[in-house]
Structure formats: structure tokens, C-alpha cells
Amino acid sequence: MRVYPAAPTGHVFVVDGDPGKLTVIDPKSDSAVATIDAGSKLETAVVGGNGKLYVNREQKQEIVRVDTATNEIDAHWPIPNCSSPHGLAIDLETHRLFSSCENNLLVVVDADTGTTVATLPIGARSDAAAFDPKRKLVFSSNGDGTLSVIAEKGANSFVTLASVATKVGARTMALDPESGRLYLVAGDTTINPSADPSDFRHRYVVTPGSAKLLFLDPMP
């Protein structure tokens, strides 16, 4: 479950991932005022400055746009060649969405039209994306133990800068937009030889008590 505040209504949007629904809460009345059914599993959502909320629809490989004034879905945008879109971030200045996919791709989408403007290589099994608005950097945290770093040179121009080694399973990420510091969570892992190598979730077993907080500071 993820919770997002959305202007200008002041409502709170709760993403119920597996059921494929969003619950809209009015914090003033402390009550649910609407339920939006997207029809299948949802992943990360972001809020634009235009009263729209965007959310990855994983199994359909698309981005769904929600009008927060009416609490209705007003667009379905396919994400070409994107298997299991998980992470989603937004540049509010250029109106660009960054959707990270499990199959080594990050897809850049125009947040106004739904047009794909770029497709970039990233690490495998991405679970989160982040955008640093001060430094114009896009990040993808990947389950294969890498952090992909991409520079936004313009609305339709992007350059891959680095693949930073992290830890296997370090897929969850948060960004401090002021300092530019990135935080990731991971633990030590052992390999389960009986699990298929393609079954990432059961192949790598986290050692109890080994959780670590990793962080990456921007270049000075």
C-alpha cells in the first residue's frame, strides 16, 4: 500500500496494489469518498502539478492517468516493451514520466500526451525510480545489485551516466530532493540452490538481522 497527497483537492490517494484499486480519502472528514477501479494490479504512483495522478498498471504494461478532480481514469497509455513496470517518477518542469521496468528498460513518457519519448537501458529487476529536480538526474534501483543513473539534458534528451554497485535485492529507494542523497535498503543474501535462477524472489534468501541502509550522495 502506498499513500499520495494530490493537489488541488487535498484528497489522499491510497494505492491498493494487488486489487488494482485506488481509495480516495478526504482528510478533513476522515472518510473514504471514492474508490477507483483500474482493473488489475497497480504499482507506483506520482502526482503531477496539473491535478493528475499517474500510476503504473503492471500486468497491462501501461500508465493510467487519474483526474483527481473527478476521481476518474481519463487515459490509458501503453508502455512499449516494458515488462512489469514498477518504479515511476516525474519531472514537473518538463512534464516527463520515468517508468522503470523489470526487463532492463526505463521508458520516458510525455505526461501530457502519453507519447513515449525515450527508452534507456538500466539494470535488471527494477522496483523503484526517482528524479532529482535540482540536478536533473533519474535513478533506477535494481534487484541485480545496481543503481542506474541517467542525466536529463532536455525534455527529450537523456544520457546514461553510471551503473553504481549496491547490493543484490536493493530495490527499494527514497530520495531527499534537497540534498540529493539517495537511500536504499538491503540485507545480506545467500543463494538457494534449489530455486530456479530466474526466480529471483526465492533464489536469494535474506539473512535475518542483516538489514542495511545504503546511501549515495551526489557529486559535488
Q: Language-model segments: which ranges?
A:
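Predominantly soluble domains enriched in secretory-pathway, periplasmic, or organellar proteins
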Residues: M1-P220
